[in-house]
């Protein structure tokens, strides 16, 4: 499957508004509240540059979810899943494997986001496995527990 770049026709103001919405969503996620600016630059901004994201709002224009994806090589995917390293700008279009760096759905819309991605974004990849690393905050020990998750498109 060939990946073509389709830049979004978004204004700088629209992108800034969505980034602000992602920050608002992160306030409701124990994991994302812990991110530092460098992590946001690494894990969110490339998606806006490459139009590899979905941003969801409710009927009142309030943000409810965000998801982005990268097309990585098998080697990079395996390194990301093992925790050897984090995603870098050159990774986002390095292969054919779909990797989800971030899904922020703190109000319970995760399943709806996945179903939307299956129908609207990833239909050409139907049957392919997609992976992500979910984090859960262990506040008692002040650490994040990594959990690899796979699902089918």
Swiss-Prot record:
Catalytic activities: a fatty acyl-[ACP] + L-lysyl-[protein] = N(6)-(fatty acyl)-L-lysyl-[protein] + holo-[ACP] + H(+)
Top class in the EC scheme: transferase
Record keywords: Acyltransferase, Cytolysis, Cytoplasm, Transferase
InterPro entries for this protein: RTX_toxin-activating_protC_bac
One of the protein's GO biological processes: toxin metabolic process
GO cellular component terms listed in the entry, alphabetical order: cytoplasm
Active site: 32
Pfam families linked: HlyC (PF02794)
Disrupted gene: phenotype observed: Cells lacking RtxC do not show reduced toxicity. However, the RtxA toxin displays reduced actin cross-linking activity.
UniProt EC number: 2.3.1.-
Domain of life (superkingdom): Bacteria
Homology family: Belongs to the RTX toxin acyltransferase family.
Role noted for this protein: Catalyzes fatty acylation of the protoxin (RtxA) at internal lysine residues, thereby converting it to the active toxin.
Protein known as: Lysine-acyltransferase RtxC
Organism in which the protein naturally occurs: Vibrio cholerae serotype O1 (strain ATCC 39315 / El Tor Inaba N16961)
Biological classification of the source: Bacteria, Pseudomonadati, Pseudomonadota, Gammaproteobacteria, Vibrionales
Encoding gene per record: rtxC
């Amino acid at each position: 499957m060939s990946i073509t770049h389709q830049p979004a026709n978004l204004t700088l103001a629209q992108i800034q508004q969505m980034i602000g919405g992602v920050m608002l969503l992160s306030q409701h996620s124990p994991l994302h509240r812990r991110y530092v600016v460098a992590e946001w630059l690494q894990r969110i901004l490339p998606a806006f540059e490459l139009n590899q994201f979905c941003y969801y709002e409710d009927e009142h224009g309030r943000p409810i979810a965000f998801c982005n994806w990268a097309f990585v090589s098998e080697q990079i995917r395996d390194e990301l899943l093992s925790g050897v390293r984090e995603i870098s700008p050159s990774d986002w279009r390095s292969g054919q494997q779909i990797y989800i760096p971030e899904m922020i759905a703190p109000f319970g819309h995760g399943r709806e986001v996945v179903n939307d991605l299956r129908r609207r974004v990833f239909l050409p990849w139907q049957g392919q496995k997609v992976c992500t690393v979910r984090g859960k905050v262990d506040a008692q020990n002040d650490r994040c527990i990594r959990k690899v998750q796979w699902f089918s498109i």
